[in-house]
């Protein structure tokens, strides 16, 4: 008789502590330098796997999006493992969609990390990252967690030391930002083509910064220059965060969510009051150690070691 294996997962959101667009590459994509950071805001994903002769995938979620990223992730990881089985998933969204917080990418990464464990197979991190990159440029980051530098399209990753614990808020004003248009508007402002010399100068400037929460005032998000022109309300929200005492306030990704980090917890309540009716979430930064501890706790029934990615106790 086949045994069904279950897991209840939290798929954490991310913010960008810094985001620079260096220019447009010959392949048509933009060269990025960014600092990713996981935060406590999360979706929940219940997933079960039952060995079977053929693969079937069922997803229950209120959004009812055709070809949801988690379904694509499940299909791709099953193909990579050359495994078959019945997969049932229930996704509960809390991370605002299309806000620059990586919710869909994190959900997909959760499937990539969990399914090999439940299916009793091994997929090394480079293979998972390759699958993740095909799903979306942010997905590989959620296979690492904590803080990391992202280069290229953002999917080439270099883990950074964990930044000190800090609390804050994420504001989701519900404004739709056309990411493709934001890139086009930003491209028109970039000086010339991305020559090797220009790229190296911009990379040196980026790398010369010290990435800790004490120096975040030096950070920036290049998208703000064009997105704030189209959506002045977002600029007003950032000003309110600064007025409330945020040590760092910035748009995440291409928007429209913004975040503020605070050294004074009382300032968080001031910020929430100033933000009025806009949807606001209290958050904390999640270190890589804590991120992986959350995963180990969620998958403890099915794992047998502390290596990363998690290894299944059902491996042959």
UniProtKB/Swiss-Prot annotation:
GO molecular function: 4-(cytidine 5'-diphospho)-2-C-methyl-D-erythritol kinase activity; ATP binding
Catalytic activity: 4-CDP-2-C-methyl-D-erythritol + ATP = 4-CDP-2-C-methyl-D-erythritol 2-phosphate + ADP + H(+)
Pathway: Isoprenoid biosynthesis; isopentenyl diphosphate biosynthesis via DXP pathway; isopentenyl diphosphate from 1-deoxy-D-xylulose 5-phosphate: step 3/6
Positions of the catalytic residues: 14, 138
E.C. number: 2.7.1.148
First-tier enzyme category under EC: transferase
InterPro entries assigned to the protein according to its UniProt record, in alphabetical order: GHMP_kinase_C_dom (IPR013750), GHMP_kinase_C_sf (IPR036554), GHMP_kinase_N_dom (IPR006204), IspE (IPR004424), Ribosomal_Su5_D2-typ_SF (IPR020568), Ribsml_uS5_D2-typ_fold_subgr (IPR014721)
Biological process annotations from GO: isopentenyl diphosphate biosynthetic process, methylerythritol 4-phosphate pathway; terpenoid biosynthetic process
Segments forming a coiled coil: none
Keywords: ATP-binding, Isoprene biosynthesis, Kinase, Nucleotide-binding, Transferase
Chain sites annotated for binding ATP: 96-106
Superkingdom as given in the UniProt entry: Bacteria
Pfam family, one: GHMP_kinases_C
Family under the similarity heading: Belongs to the GHMP kinase family. IspE subfamily.
PANTHER family (UniProt xref): 4-DIPHOSPHOCYTIDYL-2-C-METHYL-D-ERYTHRITOL KINASE, CHLOROPLASTIC
HAMAP family attached to this UniProt entry: IspE (MF_00061)
Function: Catalyzes the phosphorylation of the position 2 hydroxy group of 4-diphosphocytidyl-2C-methyl-D-erythritol.
The protein, known as: 4-diphosphocytidyl-2-C-methyl-D-erythritol kinase
Organism: Solibacter usitatus (strain Ellin6076)
Name of the gene this protein is made from: ispE
């Amino acid at each position: 008789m086949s045994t069904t294996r279950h897991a209840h997962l939290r798929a954490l959101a991310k913010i960008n502590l810094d985001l620079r667009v260096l220019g447009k590459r010959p392949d048509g994509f933009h060269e990025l330098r960014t600092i990713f950071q996981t935060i406590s805001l999360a979706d929940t994903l219940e997933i079960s796997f039952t060995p079977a002769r053929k693969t079937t995938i069922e997803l229950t979620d209120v959004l009812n999006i055709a070809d949801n990223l988690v379904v694509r992730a499940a299909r791709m990881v099953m193909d990579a493992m050359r495994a078959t089985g019945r997969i049932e998933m229930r996704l509960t969204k809390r991370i605002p969609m299309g806000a620059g917080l990586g919710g869909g990418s994190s959900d997909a990464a959760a499937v990539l990390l969990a399914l090999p464990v439940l299916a009793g197979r091994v997929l090394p991190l480079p293979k998972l990252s390759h699958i993740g990159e095909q799903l979306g440029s942010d997905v590989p980051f959620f296979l690492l967690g904590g803080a990391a530098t992202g280069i290229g399209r953002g999917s080439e990753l270099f883990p950074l030391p964990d930044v000190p614990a800090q609390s804050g808020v994420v504001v989701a004003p519900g404004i739709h930002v056309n990411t493709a248009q934001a890139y086009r508007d930003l491209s028109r402002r970039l000086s010339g083509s991305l020559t090797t010399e220009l790229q190296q100068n911009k990379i040196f400037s980026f790398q010369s910064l010290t990435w800790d929460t004490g120096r975040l005032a030096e950070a920036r998000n290049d998208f703000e220059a064009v997105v704030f022109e189209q959506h002045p309300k977002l600029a007003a929200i950032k000003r309110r965060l600064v007025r409330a005492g945020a040590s760092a306030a910035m748009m995440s990704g291409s928007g429209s969510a913004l975040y503020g980090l605070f050294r004074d917890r009382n300032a968080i309540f001031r910020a929430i009051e100033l933000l009025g009716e806009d949807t606001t979430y209290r958050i904390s930064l999640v270190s890589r150690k804590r991120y992986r501890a959350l995963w180990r706790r969620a998958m403890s029934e099915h794992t047998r070691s502390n290596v990363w990615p998690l290894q299944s106790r059902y491996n042959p």
